[in-house]
């Protein structure tokens, strides 16, 4: 596929051999976004872990201080009082076997799934459908809980789940290019802080090896790891 003129222009603005400060990197990403839609800003972090070993797995979640700039559709598997709690908190879809049946028929019009622990037997029936889509509730990221009100609020506020991939890389959205630079900065630092706090004790050597940031359609911009790390509180 030929490289578009706009992408070529964006690529020309980025020095791929350079590592930019967080401030300059964010400005560059905002300036190289060229799509007609409001692009998402994504961060990729290469970690010094080998996820093939269970004791080096990095997985968790973080509530970004400035959200993601999008409406997150939340589904909750719950019954009784917890069903009411989920609805009162603003969940978009709440139910049990009825939702399982819908999903078995191919319905996936939601972004996050939460379940109370007593519902996991029911949810397990559709694990093979939810898992590959990253929608399976998991206690490690706070989506299997009796505190459904809090879980719904966090998801609606911009909770991002992260999980290290085979190559030791974590990908996560941190907002929109339309965000103020300071808001993107705060979100990126919150993500990096969460990654640092999730460092496995078995990880040796340099933990955060590389950080890059990009818009949905734009080029990747390498960040100076030491500059970013020095700003993490």
UniProtKB/Swiss-Prot annotation:
Database matches in InterPro entries: Ribosom_uL1_bac-type, Ribosomal_uL1, Ribosomal_uL1-like, Ribosomal_uL1/biogenesis, Ribosomal_uL1_3-a/b-sand, Ribosomal_uL1_CS
A single GO cellular-component term on record: cytosolic large ribosomal subunit
Signal peptide: none
Keywords, alphabetical: Repressor, Ribonucleoprotein, Ribosomal protein, RNA-binding, rRNA-binding, Translation regulation, tRNA-binding
Gene Ontology terms: biological process: regulation of translation; translation
Pfam family, one: Ribosomal_L1
Molecular function GO terms recorded: rRNA binding; structural constituent of ribosome; tRNA binding
SUPFAM superfamilies: Ribosomal protein L1
CDD domains registered for this protein in UniProt: Ribosomal_L1
Statement: the UniProt record of this protein carries the keyword rRNA-binding: yes
Subunit structure as annotated in this protein's UniProt entry: Part of the 50S ribosomal subunit.
Function: Binds directly to 23S rRNA. The L1 stalk is quite mobile in the ribosome, and is involved in E site tRNA release.
HAMAP family per UniProt: Ribosomal_uL1_B
Family: Belongs to the universal ribosomal protein uL1 family.
Protein name: Large ribosomal subunit protein uL1
Originating organism: Geotalea uraniireducens (strain Rf4) (Geobacter uraniireducens)
Upper lineage: Bacteria, Pseudomonadati, Thermodesulfobacteriota, Desulfuromonadia, Geobacterales
Gene: rplA
């Amino acid at each position: 596929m030929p490289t578009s003129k706009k992408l070529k222009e964006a690529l020309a603005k980025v020095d791929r051999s350079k590592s930019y400060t967080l401030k300059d990197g964010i400005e560059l990403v905002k300036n190289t976004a060229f799509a007609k839609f409001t692009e998402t800003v994504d961060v990729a972090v290469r970690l010094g872990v080998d996820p093939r070993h269970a004791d080096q797995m990095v997985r968790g979640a973080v509530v970004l201080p400035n959200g993601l700039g999008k409406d997150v559709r939340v589904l909750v598997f719950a019954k009784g009082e917890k069903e009411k709690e989920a609805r009162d908190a603003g969940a978009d879809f709440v139910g049990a076997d009825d939702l399982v049946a819908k999903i078995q028929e191919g319905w996936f019009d939601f972004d996050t799934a939460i379940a109370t622990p007593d519902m996991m037997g029911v949810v397990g029936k559709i694990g093979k459908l939810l898992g590959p889509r990253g929608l399976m509730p998991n206690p490690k990221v706070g989506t299997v809980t009796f505190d459904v009100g809090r879980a719904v609020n966090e998801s609606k506020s911009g909770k991002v789940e992260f999980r290290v991939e085979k190559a030791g890389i974590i990908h996560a959205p941190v907002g929109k290019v339309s965000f103020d630079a300071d808001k993107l900065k705060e979100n990126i630092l919150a993500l990096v802080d969460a990654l640092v706090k999730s460092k496995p004790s078995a990880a040796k050597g340099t933990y955060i090896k590389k950080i890059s940031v990009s818009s949905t359609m734009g080029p990747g911009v390498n960040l100076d790891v030491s500059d970013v790390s020095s700003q993490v509180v």
